[in-house]
């Protein structure tokens, strides 16, 4: 079964909380702060694995979460870091943000590693805050929250050569014949229900061929299985457009050719700019000659491309086709390898966050209470516990409480009026 798309909620581990603790030992009368820091939360990584060929291992999971860091302890003990999570995916998997549809990363080679959710840093214990001005700090921090994302995983098979054509064009038979694989074949619609890959060897070189199934008229609009599988064409360097000339398969092979071309145009016309080998198949059929002549006559009116005539089943004339495919591949190999390396390098191992201006919003809730919020305020609300007066004072400094209160006054609020940050009420001074 082909499982090539799924959506998962991913969460990195939260950082552990720092603690407030005091040294109380008979031989150390000075005492002092002794609270340790929290451990770092685990990261979530994506890693390419060429041994996988579908997303079935992820299909039935709703979420994947890394381990939280442990809280700090007394005696300056730092909490244990949370374990990282490594999600293995097949090579060819594209991961997008399911909310924004932004592509996050393309996994293009085995071993490629990408940090998709970063674990939160551990919070500081009170020992961290000791200074010449504050020798007994009653301060601590909670750990940072781990990053989260709802991500869509979509597998687009990576192949050097993709075989296109209507059902019964003989794509699976040709891949079987050239690669000595054993794909299911028969003379009925949609024999192949998922992209099938075969390695074709020729003159000490090898290329991966993919049989792309399900393309019929209106495939680009979702008819048949076409829309699900057209996407696999996008990664192929070359395409073979296979057209059956057997009477049992077609009334007009040129019309069959145009059907596929129109579907490619509607799906993504850029695909037509790639090298496409036009191949008439099943020339071994006794009734094929008239269809061959009909196709060649009509095709010459629109193109001067070379048309190959083969029998995939009997391997007739296939060497000529392979010779030209491998020759063209060698011409472009270095360029494609360079482009692949550049693309992989464009996905840095550690994401670079886009800095955004922090905008503070002031809105009234259903009870006419002012609600103040921003990313910075939410961050420090989560980081600083309100368990000591010093922590509360530090929170107010971090969010610039004086500026918030002045803005509320400018909006008509008065001294003594209440306002809310997250779930905590404050009064304007």
Swiss-Prot record:
GO biological processes: ribosome biogenesis
Subcellular location: Cytoplasm
Domain (Obg): residue spans on this chain: 1-158
Residues annotated as binding Mg(2+): 172, 192
EC code: 3.6.5.-
Broad class of the protein's primary localization: cytoplasm
Domain of life: Bacteria
Residues of the OCT domain: 351-429
PANTHER family per the UniProt record, alphabetical: DEVELOPMENTALLY REGULATED GTP-BINDING PROTEIN-RELATED, MITOCHONDRIAL RIBOSOME-ASSOCIATED GTPASE 2
Protein's job: An essential GTPase which binds GTP, GDP and possibly (p)ppGpp with moderate affinity, with high nucleotide exchange rates and a fairly low GTP hydrolysis rate. Plays a role in control of the cell cycle, stress response, ribosome biogenesis and in those bacteria that undergo differentiation, in morphogenesis control.
Family (UniProt): Belongs to the TRAFAC class OBG-HflX-like GTPase superfamily. OBG GTPase family.
The protein, known as: GTPase Obg
Organism: Malacoplasma penetrans (strain HF-2)
Biological classification of the source: Bacteria, Bacillati, Mycoplasmatota, Mycoplasmoidales, Mycoplasmoidaceae
